[in-house]
Each structure stands twice: as C-alpha cells, then as structure tokens.
Amino acid sequence: MPKKVFIKTFGCQMNEYDSDKMSDVLHAAEGYENTQNIDEADLILFNTCSVREKAQEKVFSDLGRVKHLKAKGVLIGVGGCVASQEGEAIIQRAPYVDVVFGPQTLHRLPQLLASRARLGKPQVDISFPEIEKFDHLPPARVEGASAFVSIMEGCSKYCSYCVVPYTRGEEVSRPFEDVLVEVAGLADQGVKEVTLLGQNVNAYRGSMGGTAEIADFATLLEYVSEIPGIERIRYITSHPNEFTQRLIDAYATLPKLVNHLHLPVQHGSDRILMAMKRGYTAMEYKSTIRKLRAIRPDLAMSSDFIVGFPGETEDDFEKLMKLVNDVGYDTSFSFIFSPRPGTPAANLADDTPHEVKLKRLQHLQATLDDSVRAISASRLGTVQRILVEGTARKDASELMGRTECNRVVILKGQPRLIGQMVDVRITEASQRSLRGEVLTQDDTVAA
C-alpha cells in the first residue's frame, strides 16, 4: 500500500506550484500518493507563506494541532517562506518537526527524509542553490486543462515592506529551453492553458541554449504561444517598473495572451510609493495601462493594495482612491500594512490609529466591490469563451469554467465538456461569478 502525504498550502500561486512539485518529487522517489484526509497521512507538510502578519504563529498553531499524530509514526515537515525565514528556530520551538526546507530546496525533500531516518534527528536545509531545484524535478503530473509553470525564482526589487527577497532569494531565471520543454510536455498531456509564474516575471532573462543570447519575457511569450495545443497564456506576478514596450506590444501580436492582467500598484500616492521603494509614480503606472488598453480596450485589470503604510495621510489615501477610480479594477487584493521582521519598513514610525486604517480599508474594498459588480453587469448578454475546468462546487450536476479575464462561470453541460473550450452566453451576473448557456454544438444539457 503506497504511503500518503497531506500537503497544506498557504499563500500565492508560487506556493501552489511548489506544493505540486513536492508531491511530484515524493511520488517519483518514494511512491507517495496525495491525500486530503490528514488522519491517513504518513507525511504531513506545511508549505508556508510569510507575507502577511502573524504567519509564523499560524504555522506553530497548525503544528500544534498535528503533534498528537507523531504517536502513530507520522512525519511532519515545514517548507516555504516561513521555513526559509525561521530555519532552526522551528526545530527549537517544535522539536517534533522532522524536516525544514525552503522554496529552493524542496527537490531535496526525499534526501532530507532519508537523513532524518538514518541519523535520528531533524533535518534543516534552507539554502539558496540558485536554480538547481529545476534540474532535479521529475516531469509534472497534471490533472485538468490548466497548469502552472515556474519561469523564475526570487525577487531583486527589495521593496521596503517585502520579505520575499530574504525568503526566496534574488531573481534567477530558468533557462529558456527548459521552460519551453515543460510547456510542450504539458500540452502533450492535454493542457490548454498555462500560467507562467514568478515573483517578477517581466524581469525574466533566460539563457538560450549554449549561446550568450538572453531571452526576455516578451520573447518567452512569443515562443510559448507557438507551442501546439496551448490556447491560453496567463502570467503572474509582474512589476510595473519593468513593463517594457515589447511586453505591451505582445498584447497586439499574441492572441493567446489572455485579456486579463494582474499588475500590483500597492498605492496611488507618489510619496508612499517612494517610501515603499516601488520605483515608479502613479502617473507612470496609469500610463502603462493606457497603452495596454489602447491595444486591448476591454483588458481586465486586477491589483494589490496596501492601506495604512507608515506615514500615510488622508491626502495619500485620497490619491490611492483616485487611482482606483481612474483604472476600474476587476477584482483585487487589499490589506492593512503589517510590518515584516527584517524589512526596512518595519522600522518606520507609524502613528496612524488602527481604527483609521480599518476605515480606509473598508472604503477601498467597498469601492473595489462596486467596480466588480459594474463589470459583472456589463458581461450580461455577451458571449464569452470559457475553459471548462470541472464540476461546480455547490452543485456537482453543473460545470464550472473561467473566462479570459479569470471570472468564474457556472453552466450546465455534460462532463465530457471538462477540459474543453466552449462559447457561453452570459445570462446571470453576481459580484464574483457569472452564469451562462453553452452555444456550441457540444451543448448537450445533462439530464
């Protein structure tokens, strides 16, 4: 009977990708199978995120809940950014943990577990071995028609509030051909949509074969779009400071590039953006969007926002709200600033009361919600191209898919539509999802 692994993932799409790779590595090396039932697991892994406040405490809280399973011989591991940040401190506080590993050493997980068994003591490896992990990962196992592909690791921007450069290291790009081979392999398995991942994908600089040539992100997009079977290309996350004209032009020449862009702005005040060390102004950010929408007028935008950064005044906040209203976002993520240990912003004086920050956040979120509702309503009666991903969560007799702009659509249809592209007329619109009717010849409604 195969051993089973339970993986709990926190945070971003990079962590989701890394969790899939942990599963692939363990399956290839030890035959592990995934389980959603923690009580039947032989190995429990927490793939952690350190971006938000109290991330470390959440990890130790989860560890405490599974400590009793050690009596059954269950192994426990902590990976991800909290592991990278805390390292040996995790073992000191939770000595029942067997392995601690960072985002760049997940490929060594089988060796760490073997060393734990051989030496009889916890193992820690949170080093930064450049891009080595991609050389040791087995071919991806995929289910469904969409997949993530990591094209680079780390970030070299060192925004004043962000812990990512310290937990994932500086920017390192995968070789150009390696990315193309992985995408082609996924296409051979039936994948129609790929999401290219990185902390800052538009900083991609991949070596091309044995030459001295370097491929930038726009070049990578061009080549990925030529791979047979791939019908949609997404990417996340990009940085406004490196959104080149070549990348903007790609929206005119690459129809497979979806009509959705997540471009984190963080704030709308130039003074706050400078304190954040973002490297651009609100006007420069909006200029990029104007250029993009000149090419794709209906381009759906999403973003990240931080409210209550140290020193934020009411005037700063009003400038943020102006930017939000000027752009018109279709879904976004917004948070109250939380200081991350070891970052420059953690040492900034902050005299804004929490109640004021909360009120500002609520105002921002209400405005963003209004924008989402208006955009949803504008979709009524339109025909949208949907990638059907599976059955709907609330009703297994219905199907669920996504539009190019990443909006969930519920529809009726036979299970054979799963994994297919279908045209759907939108008949209902709510804030977070749409409902539609299939228009193609495959429209055989399930009985």
From Swiss-Prot:
Residues 3-118 form the MTTase N-terminal domain. Binds 2 [4Fe-4S] clusters. One cluster is coordinated with 3 cysteines and an exchangeable S-adenosyl-L-methionine. Keywords: 4Fe-4S, Cytoplasm, Iron, Iron-sulfur, Metal-binding, S-adenosyl-L-methionine, Transferase, tRNA processing. Its cofactor is [4Fe-4S] cluster. [4Fe-4S] cluster 1 binds at C12, C49, C81. [4Fe-4S] cluster 2 binds at C155, C159, C162. Residues 141-374 form the Radical SAM core domain. Coiled coil: none annotated. It is found in: Cytoplasm. One of its GO terms (molecular function) is 4 iron, 4 sulfur cluster binding. Disulfide bonds: none annotated. GO terms for cellular component: cytosol. Its EC number is 2.8.4.3. Transmembrane segments: none annotated. Residues 377-440 form the TRAM domain. It catalyses: N(6)-dimethylallyladenosine(37) in tRNA + (sulfur carrier)-SH + AH2 + 2 S-adenosyl-L-methionine = 2-methylsulfanyl-N(6)-dimethylallyladenosine(37) in tRNA + (sulfur carrier)-H + 5'-deoxyadenosine + L-methionine + A + S-adenosyl-L-homocysteine + 2 H(+). Belongs to the methylthiotransferase family. MiaB subfamily. Monomer. Catalyzes the methylthiolation of N6-(dimethylallyl)adenosine (i(6)A), leading to the formation of 2-methylthio-N6-(dimethylallyl)adenosine (ms(2)i(6)A) at position 37 in tRNAs that read codons beginning with uridine. This is tRNA-2-methylthio-N(6)-dimethylallyladenosine synthase.
